């Protein structure tokens, strides 16, 4: 298990374009392997568990495709739930009343995006980076 506060390299900064394709990766969430993703919106990087708040399904309709056509909101391809890319909060659709996306802490430095594990989200192993699915 990685120590809390230990930064783990996720991807080069250039891999995340504003409103573009996200980077998928896997984490241990509460001890179980789970999908996650990172995106860039408004010049900042954000990451979330890849799990709709409405029904526990992955959001992307094609691998890494998380934004709706205007690239303003994240969308669940299954039921159309809409989420704020900067907060993960439900902004409409099927997620209303079900909460939002579970955030994962990221940090950007030296042209890299780093993941900051916490008590619930850990890397799959201490020896392997959280590579894209």
Regions found by a protein language model. Name each.
Residues 52, 76-79:
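Short cysteine clusters
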Residues 1-69, 84-85, 100-133:
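N-terminal pre-ligand scaffold of iron-sulfur
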Residues 81-82, 89:
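Short Gly/Pro-enriched loop/turn and capping motifs at secondary-structure junctions
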Residues 66-74, 90-99:
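Short cysteine/histidine-rich metal-coordination sites, predominantly Zn2+-binding motifs
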